[in-house]
Amino acid sequence: MDQQTLKQLADEGVYERCASRPKILMNMPTHYCPGCNHDTVLKIMAELIEEMGIARRTTIVWPVGCSAFGSWYVTHKVGQVREDFGGVDSVDAPHGRATAVATGIKRMQPNRVVISFQGDGDFAAIGTAESVHTFNRGENITSIFINNAIYGMTGGQMAPTTLPQQKSTTSPYGRTVKDMGGPIRMCEMLSTLDGTVYAERVAMTDARHILRAKRAIKRGLEIQLWHNETGRRGTSLIEILLGCPTNWKMGPAQANQYVAEEMTRCFPLGVFKQPEK
């Protein structure tokens, strides 16, 4: 990159935006393990809420799992941020019930922007029934689903999304499809339901894919806002692949490589369903 381009980026404030913290995020370290991209997802979601000007009417429903403490990091009182900005609402849901809680909030306050933020154990295991029926009913919420192919918070047990032959504490010799079944592909499954209006799978492996993930989350939020205005219904799903260096016993770079080379074979990236024009 030449000096003129670097200067242009600096003049446009690109470096400051990349290094800055969105105003709705508290100025504190997160609990996420080193090398985990959960906090990157949290940051781009917060950036979008700020950029779209929807903080005062947004409610995020947090799960049980690695993101259980997400509510610690977002501001809730106007006094914690600029007086003209405000914070978002947060709700901590019982294990697997985030989409059910989000449904209740949305039905009681249909003009709010409601986001459920869940991992694969919460969304695709104990919460499978809630997830499927929320999408089948076409509840007007945006669901962010983190798929790291393992139970992260509880110590690395096999998840519904664990890959064939992938090792975990409960499959120390690797997952065998014959005895343990295969990975559940939530995007593919939920996109068959009439109530699902948008489903896309993205990854957090490099800058290009992170920007694609941000665009996908923005699309899901835009659809919800459009439905709020028009009275239409439909649920949006953004599935995000990311690594778990701690429980995979890998370094961050190796975990990103595993996502890019192995996980995407089992969980292809792309748009599986989008609104009809």
Feature-to-residue mapping (PLM):
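Flexible, low-complexity linker and terminal segments
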Residues: 1-18, 22, 27-28, 225-234, ...
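Cofactor-binding active-site loop characterized by glycine-rich and histidine/acidic residues
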Residues: 2-142, 161-163
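Conserved thiamine diphosphate
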Residues: 20, 111, 159-226
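Structural motif
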Residues: 58-60, 112-116, 140-145, 188, ...
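Glycine-rich beta-alpha junction loops
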Residues: 64-66, 148-150, 206, 240-247
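Short acidic/glycine-rich loop or secondary-structure boundary segments that cap or lie
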Residues: 70, 152-154, 208-211, 245-249
